[in-house]
């Protein structure tokens, strides 16, 4: 008799995706982040659902409803801080996942990579709208500044901004629609994750060597389920430590002040995970140029498969490319730091240099170094 997990129409899909899935035997801990992202998404949907039961998306009561959740709802503070810090964990895993893809050449699975880039955009949009919901000072002014960037689009810009606002400023209509989209998008993201996995399972996973591993595959369960559970415990430990001991460490103190359209905070800045893109935006003195640089800084990931010049897939055996990759990481950390600093000397010039370096590494240096390594290896 056939095992039910292999014959049942629904269980068969689960079996082929998570149990009997042939997986390269050599994949390292860098391959843990996919499953961690899935768990982060599930955690965000669950905590978000319970928060939505107590939250009101009205400018008069939004701030009070968040305070009510923290003070009066049973374990409401746990839900709120799990959700807020869970977003930070989500982005840490997301950036490490993308970094892994860049380092090991996973972007050559073009369909999986492109769906992944769209997923990144969707998660960023969701996080931005979620940051507006508590209706604190930074929520209000962050929403005003970022949505206002669309006014840089020629001809239709101003109309587009007012259409998104639903008013002539960020107001009740804006908050209500942001709440609606913030609730809806994670479910769309979940569907896109399925597509992401569908494309991945068409080709199978990449591995650290970048060499096809068809001859050496092992079942996903129990080997990688156990390995993923270790990663899960480490992430949950970090998240709970953050929630229980330093819940506001990654937040902005200004967001504990109710939104006031008449008082601008001294330094308007987004959450830490958007600071690198914000620094690129600010480094260009022209509004339209800044907006284009901001969008291209993420959209550039789409063209990375086209910029791959090396005859090796992974960077494992390419030391010069490795140096360039870690320079890119250092550059992104520098941009993150600059994004949180005021617009004054020397931060402005550091931000501009880091922005130029960011685009130069990806568009110019990485393809050139790939060709150079081919030449050095006489390929």
UniProtKB/Swiss-Prot annotation:
Cofactor: heme b
A GO cellular component entry from the record: respiratory chain complex III
Function, in words: Component of the ubiquinol-cytochrome c reductase complex (complex III or cytochrome b-c1 complex) that is part of the mitochondrial respiratory chain. The b-c1 complex mediates electron transfer from ubiquinol to cytochrome c. Contributes to the generation of a proton gradient across the mitochondrial membrane that is then used for ATP synthesis.
Domain of life according to the entry: Eukaryota
Biological process annotations from GO: mitochondrial electron transport, ubiquinol to cytochrome c
InterPro entries for this protein: Cyt_b/b6_C (IPR005798), Cyt_b/b6_C_sf (IPR036150), Cyt_b/b6_N (IPR005797), Cytb/b6-like_sf (IPR027387), Cytochrome_b (IPR030689), Cytochrome_b_C_euk/bac (IPR048260), Cytochrome_b_N_euk/bac (IPR048259), Di-haem_cyt_TM (IPR016174)
Name this protein carries in UniProt: Cytochrome b
Pfam families: Cytochrom_B_C, Cytochrome_B
Cofactor binding annotation: Binds 2 heme b groups non-covalently.
Residue stretches spanning the membrane: 33-53, 77-98, 113-133, 178-198, 226-246, 288-308, 320-340, 347-367
Family (UniProt): Belongs to the cytochrome b family.
Residues given in the record as a ubiquinone binding sites: 201
Keyword match Disulfide bond: no
Gene Ontology MF terms in the entry: metal ion binding; ubiquinol-cytochrome-c reductase activity
Membrane topology: Multi-pass membrane protein
Additional comment: Heme 1 (or BL or b562) is low-potential and absorbs at about 562 nm, and heme 2 (or BH or b566) is high-potential and absorbs at about 566 nm.
Principal subcellular localisation of the protein: mitochondrion
């Amino acid at each position: 008799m056939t095992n039910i997990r292999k014959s049942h129409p629904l269980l068969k899909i689960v079996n082929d995706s998570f149990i009997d899935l042939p997986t390269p035997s050599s994949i390292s801990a860098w391959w843990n982040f996919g499953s961690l992202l899935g768990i982060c998404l599930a955690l965000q949907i669950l905590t978000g659902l319970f928060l939505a039961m107590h939250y009101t998306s009205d400018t008069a009561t939004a701030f009070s409803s968040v305070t009510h959740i923290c003070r009066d709802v049973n374990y409401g503070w746990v839900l709120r801080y799990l959700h807020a810090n869970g977003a930070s964990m989500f982005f840490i895993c997301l950036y490490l996942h993308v970094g892994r893809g860049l380092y090991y050449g996973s972007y050559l699975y073009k369909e999986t990579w492109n769906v992944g880039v769209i997923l990144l955009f969707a998660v960023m949009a969701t996080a931005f709208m979620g940051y507006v919901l508590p209706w604190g000072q930074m929520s209000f002014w962050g929403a005003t500044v970022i949505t206002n960037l669309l006014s840089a689009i020629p001809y239709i810009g101003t109309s587009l901004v007012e259409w998104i606002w639903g008013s002539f400023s960020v107001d009740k209509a804006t908050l209500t629609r942001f709440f609606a989209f913030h609730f809806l998008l994670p479910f769309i993201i979940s569907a896109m994750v399925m597509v992401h996995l569908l494309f991945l399972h068409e080709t199978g996973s990449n591995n650290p060597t970048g060499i096809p591993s068809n001859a050496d595959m092992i079942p996903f369960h129990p080997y990688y389920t156990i390995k993923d559970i270790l990663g899960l415990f480490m992430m949950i430990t970090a998240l709970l430590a953050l929630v229980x001991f330093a819940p506001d460490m990654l937040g902005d103190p200004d967001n504990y002040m109710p939104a006031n359209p008449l008082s601008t905070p001294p330094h308007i800045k987004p959450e830490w995970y958007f600071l690198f893109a914000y620094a690129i935006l600010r480094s260009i003195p022209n509004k339209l140029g800044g907006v284009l640089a901001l969008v291209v800084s993420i959209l550039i990931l789409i063209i990375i498969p086209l910029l791959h010049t090396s005859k090796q897939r992974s960077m494992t055996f390419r030391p010069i490319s490795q140096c360039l990759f870690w320079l890119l990481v250092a550059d992104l950390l520098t941009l993150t730091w600059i994004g949180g600093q005021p617009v004054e000397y020397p931060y402005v010039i550091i931000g501009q240099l880091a922005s130029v370096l960011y685009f130069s590494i990806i568009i110019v240096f990485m393809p050139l170094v790939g060709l150079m390594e081919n030449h050095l290896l006489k390929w």
